[in-house]
Amino acid sequence: MDFKRLTAFFAIALVIMIGWEKMFPTPKPVPAPQQAAQKQAATASAEAALAPATPITVTTDTVQAVIDEKSGDLRRLTLLKYKATGDENKPFVLFGDGKEYTYVAQSELLDAQGNNILKGIGFSAPKKQYTLNGDTVEVRLSAPETNGLKIDKVYTFTKDSYLVNVRFDIANGSGQTANLSADYRIVRDHSEPEGQGYFTHSYVGPVVYTPEGNFQKVSFSDLDDDAKSGKSEAEYIRKTPTGWLGMIEHHFMSTWILQPKGGQSVCAAGDCHIDIKRRSDKLYSASVSVPLAAIQAGAKAETAVNLYAGPQTTSVIANIADNLQLAKDYGKVHWFASPLFWLLNQLHNIIGNWGWAIVVLTIIVKAVLYPLTNASYRSMAKMRAAAPKLQTIKEKYGDDRMAQQQAMMQLYKDEKINPLGGCLPMLLQIPVFIGLYWALFASVELRQAPWLGWITDLSRADPYYILPIIMAATMFAQTYLNPPPTDPMQAKMMKIMPLVFSVMFFFFPAGLVLYWVVNNLLTIAQQWHINRSIEKQRAQGEVVS
């Protein structure tokens, strides 16, 4: 069948792409001398802009944060409950400003002309080490009075949370009305997290959600184009009364929340202005400017915005802000992957183990598809039973392909066989496979989630390749249950396919391979039962419908 040939070709192409990516990863381009000089200048500029002062360390049960005392920037954020991708002996570091990469959260107050009112003036804190002992820990950074304004920046960390409240306390002693705005930014370079590959690649970059534009990704490449052209043409909403924005990467995110779920928007004094760009220092910035109500002489005011910097745990982020769960990158199949993960999550809540939840989900999906797949498998079983007659036709007509095809079509008609009926089971599984792939790949809930024995992380490949080998065995078993192709070349290809798919699945998440193994076992049981039933009917001389 042409479909089988196409499937085999597709599978081999996938393996070639995976193998090439693994053995010959795309090298990073070596900059030309002029480009290298420009890069060094840009790096020097970036280091000057982010020059560290005395660090302030904050430790809670979930994070260890490092705040730059002078600028008040959040320079480093370690997620203590998550292991590093490449080294399970170390915790995962989200923010950092070292030699490896730059990824920080910044905030400042601007005057009516858009200038930082504390430029060149540093904050100070009463101590350098803070540890969570109760429900919250507060870090107050105070700046000397400037132009009659007394400003404090206050970080509040909460127990068992990745939500950080960043607040400015302002006392206006200038003798005149102060018209200010607060600017909140996420700044990072374009480096990708460790573990990104051809089939394990997730979006990295700025995102924004607004009621006007819904969820939008703003790619680094679009921002590069804007920087080269000097225009601002990247597609995103620039003025909004509410929403959120920031940066995402595989499993993790950092976003400024303009309106907490069920709360008031910080844009109450006027629309917030969003600016996503590549800066002159080659760093990328996702920022929002929040206008403040006029502060009268002698009055005090405060403005606070929540920063969520942590894992993309659906049950958590969905309760922080409207549609924040859209930051979980399901690619272009969100419409299918999201409900699949919802069902998987419900099963996990009942069973308590993500691996067994995948097994039960597979059984449910198989049961839902049963009415459709059953007819197709019966067609395949009838094709298998008619194989001797097909071989007779082939021997009778030899090289006369036209007569051979006519005789085969007449046989299909007499035996009530649909020669394309066997394609349907695989076609039906393709959207499920793709949706479940993204549901498992994108969901941080499965990161470090064990199943049993050697499977200690369902989001990563089987370390000993046991599941892919089992999957190959089940695929070999299926080839003997299905009707043999009449074309010798196709027959050889169908025997090679199990090996091809098993190699491909070496690099897939163990949770996905588990789904495929269970699905194959159920398919084998179903096909075996149907084959036995049809063979029994033929042996008894009954008409097979």
From Swiss-Prot:
Domain of life: Bacteria
Keyword Hydrolase: no
Any Gene Ontology biological process: protein insertion into membrane
Subcellular location: Cell inner membrane
Bilayer-crossing regions: 350-370, 424-444, 461-481, 498-518
Alphabetical keyword list: Cell inner membrane, Cell membrane, Chaperone, Membrane, Protein transport, Transmembrane, Transmembrane helix, Transport
Molecular function, one GO term: membrane insertase activity
Pfam families referenced in this protein's UniProt entry, alphabetically: 60KD_IMP, YidC_periplas
Membrane topology: Multi-pass membrane protein
Span of the signal peptide: none
Primary localisation category: membrane
GO cellular component entries: plasma membrane
InterPro entries: Membr_insert_YidC, Membr_insert_YidC_N, YidC/ALB3/OXA1/COX18, YidC/Oxa/ALB_C, YidC_ALB_C, YidC_periplasmic_sf
Family: Belongs to the OXA1/ALB3/YidC family. Type 1 subfamily.
Function: Required for the insertion and/or proper folding and/or complex formation of integral membrane proteins into the membrane. Involved in integration of membrane proteins that insert both dependently and independently of the Sec translocase complex, as well as at least some lipoproteins. Aids folding of multispanning membrane proteins.
Matching PANTHER family: CYTOCHROME C OXIDASE ASSEMBLY PROTEIN COX18, MITOCHONDRIAL, OXA1
Name the record gives this protein: Membrane protein insertase YidC
Organism, as annotated: Neisseria gonorrhoeae (strain NCCP11945)
